Swiss-Prot record:
Segments on the Lumenal face: 1-8, 121-148
Protein's name according to its UniProt entry: Guided entry of tail-anchored proteins factor 1
Family recorded in the similarity comment: Belongs to the WRB/GET1 family.
Name of the gene: Get1
One BP annotation, GO: otic vesicle development
Coiled-coil segments on the chain, per record: 39-94
UniProt subunit comment: Component of the Golgi to ER traffic (GET) complex, which is composed of GET1, CAMLG/GET2 and GET3. Within the complex, GET1 and CAMLG form a heterotetramer which is stabilized by phosphatidylinositol binding and which binds to the GET3 homodimer. Interacts with CAMLG/GET2 (via C-terminus). GET3 shows a higher affinity for CAMLG than for GET1.
Membrane topology qualifier: Multi-pass membrane protein
Region ranges (Interaction with GET3/TRC40): 39-97
Species this protein is from: Mus musculus (Mouse)
Keywords annotated in UniProt: Coiled coil, Endoplasmic reticulum, Membrane, Transmembrane, Transmembrane helix
């Protein structure tokens, strides 16, 4: 394909990139949760600790507090210690999970910004699409920015329009 043919399909390229980025933005929470679950295998240890605590609580319910106070108190301290250990473990895992999700979100937005900047750079002086100038008469200079082509739609305006249209189309799925 020649450069002029590539420029002719620029509107579709930009629209597809904007659609893909918005779709990924909607799927980002699910994607980051999946990735963090894959990276963290501590949930098994937590469930094992919960099972141990549950077992000790059942054992505690069978012990008579009046007759076997020392055993009852020892078991209760053990349950409290294990519960505190579990809480600490869960807090650490939750903090790590938040860091992973934050990193994935930041990486996505940096990639999206780089993609949009590269599209603006490539199509800065070329109109993404050309329509009859009377269709956009009152706003033709604003819509054509930065190309200055009569009836042309500039990349910045096209990206804004695509973002709005795609956001409206994908709103029911978010």
């Amino acid at each position: 394909m020649s450069a002029s043919e590539t420029d002719r399909w620029a509107w579709l390229l930009v629209l597809s990139f904007v659609f893909g980025c918005n779709l990924l933005r909607i799927l980002l929470p699910s994607l980051s949760s999946f990735i963090s679950r894959v990276l963290q295998k501590d949930a098994e240890q937590e469930s094992q600790m919960r099972a141990e605590i549950q077992g000790m609580k059942q054992e505690l319910s069978t012990v008579n507090m009046m007759d076997e106070f020392a055993r009852y108190a020892r078991l209760e301290r053990k349950i409290n210690k294990m519960t505190d250990k579990l809480k600490t473990h869960v807090k650490a895992r939750t903090a790590q999970l938040a860091k992973i999700k934050w990193f994935i979100s930041v990486a996505f937005y940096i990639l999206q910004a780089a993609l949009m900047i590269s599209l603006i750079w490539k199509y800065y002086s070329v109109p993404v699409a050309v329509v009859p100038s009377k269709w956009i008469t009152p706003l033709d200079r604003l819509v054509a920015f930065p190309t200055r082509v009569a009836g042309g739609i500039g990349i910045t305006c096209w990206i804004l329009v695509c973002n709005k249209v795609v956001a409206i189309v994908l709103h029911p799925f978010s």
